[in-house]
Curated annotation (Swiss-Prot):
Lineage: Bacteria, Pseudomonadati, Pseudomonadota, Gammaproteobacteria, Enterobacterales
Keyword Iron annotated: no
Phenotype of null mutants: Essential, it cannot be disrupted; cell division is arrested and cells form unseparated doublets with well-defined septa.
The name this protein goes by in its record: Putative pre-16S rRNA nuclease
Function, as annotated: Could be a nuclease involved in processing of the 5'-end of pre-16S rRNA.
Protein species of origin: Salmonella typhi
Gene: yqgF
Length: 138
């Protein structure tokens, strides 16, 4: 069973990032990565992988509330496949429904409107995705 996991909240302009430990079931945000129409700076992804050496990558899978796919779903899958193809690391897709809503709510409670900048919301969403993955017993 892997110990260190890196999570991504895929977006077309910003990709949230979180690091977590399976043994504690906790995660913390890392700085978000800017993207150009969903394409990240792959050298930044490579640096993250070298620095944290995760055993597994979790990518949030955006779904509609009824579980059906939306336009962003295919792009998140493509992002996950590219990470696996480029770096050979295990990548798992995980349902991310309501993670952004929960992230915004938590950030607002702690810091009001000033805390709601895009990068912070995206990385807070990545934390929620990873903690949800841990809670489901993975």
């Amino acid at each position: 069973m892997s110990d260190t996991l890196l999570a991504f909240d895929f977006g077309t302009k910003s990709i949230g990032v979180a690091i977590g430990q399976r043994i504690t079931g906790t995660a913390r945000p890392l700085p978000a990565i800017k993207a150009q129409d969903g394409t990240p700076d792959w050298t930044l992804i490579e640096r993250l992988l070298k620095e944290w050496q995760p055993d597994e990558i979790i990518v949030g899978l955006p779904l509609n509330m009824d579980g059906t796919e939306q336009p962003l779903t295919a792009r998140a899958r493509k992002f996950a496949n590219r990470i696996h193809g480029r770096f050979g690391v295990t990548v798992t897709l995980h349902d991310e429904r309501l993670s952004t809503v929960e992230a915004r709510s938590g950030l607002f409670e702690r810091g009001g409107y000033r805390a709601l900048n895009k990068g912070k919301v995206d990385s807070a969403s990545a934390v929620i995705i990873l903690e949800s993955y841990f809670e489901q017993g993975y």
